[in-house]
Amino acid sequence: MSSKSSSSTALFNQAANTVSTEDIPRILSIHAAASRSMKPPLILGLPGSSKTEQVAAWAAANGYVMFTCMLPHLGVQDLKGYGVPDREANVMRFMPNGDLPFGNGKYADTHGGLKPLLFLDELTNASVPVFNCALQLINDRCIGDNVLFEDTLIIAAGNTAAMRTGSNKLTASVADRMSIYNVRPSINGILKWMSHEDNRGNPWVVAYLQANAQTGEGGLWTTKLSEWNGEEPLDSARSYHKGLSAYLNQYGSDREMLGDALFPAFCAAHVGCSAGTKFAEFVRLSVEVGDIDDMIQDAENCSVPENPSIKWGVAARLVSRAARDEDTFGKCLVLARRLTPVSMRPSGKQFTAFETFLTKAVVTANTRTATWESWRKAALASSQSMTS
């Protein structure tokens, strides 16, 4: 992460326990392997940095059923259960919450091998009574007589008090019972997440973030929270994906998008004034390069831009065209390769960063495509210049 985009890391003072969002899957795998012999992980990070999404994706890929407790929204009864009088024994019994993995033995034995993952989200924003109930879950793996399944994996996430989310500082009792990871936002992490078909990002957003990752011209969370006015939108991973990307998908063409007088305002409304203005300018300059269809037809000889950021804009415009057919895809891939200077191109049949971006985007956007390799082979066969 460049110095221009590292303001968020100052919140962690470059602590030794600081990791990237890209590291979350590996961290979860290590804790899952150790299971009950290891303290549960607590993932602390800026809001909108894809903590929950990363956990959900890991759970789905590793055979876990995710039970999410959004703790700020819950009362004590939601965790402890609701009291039901046992008149014969003259005691109060608590009926367990059906949304939590309470039960005897192993969950996997009766659920086709699937294991339960109890995700305690927004732990640091929970009320004190709920926080204390959650602490018993973490410490004793039970609340009263209600016991978690033996194979339950507990994971928690939240924000720190410095992040201006209304979070509370951890108590020593919680800090002593959890493995705490401070997670910094990662462009590469969100790009990898957005490349999945279920999380498909708009090509312009992906290209802009790719350009930032390659050139260091900004990144995620460029607004310092210490200077934030409390009113302007923030350029988080959530803002780019669920805000800006979803908004851009409403346009039918680049011309329609740039012809909208409110386009810059819409961009700023989703990711903040600074990031939104830069994004709108990135799109405008990329489109001004020329007619992308003419460039594709003359892929081997047309002029290409020299500005690294604008090159990513051209690559973004290739995505929708490349998915038309394999012949067009081959030409787009030739053009994508030419965006990388000859001296920096890999030898043989290895892809450049632009070719990799284009191929992944096309495979993600085109469900008719069988595999990445089918497109790759077709492209290699369509033009001998691919290896030059």
Question: Over which residues does each language-model region extend?
Answer:
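C-terminal regulatory/interaction module of P-loop NTP-utilizing enzymes
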Residues: 2-388
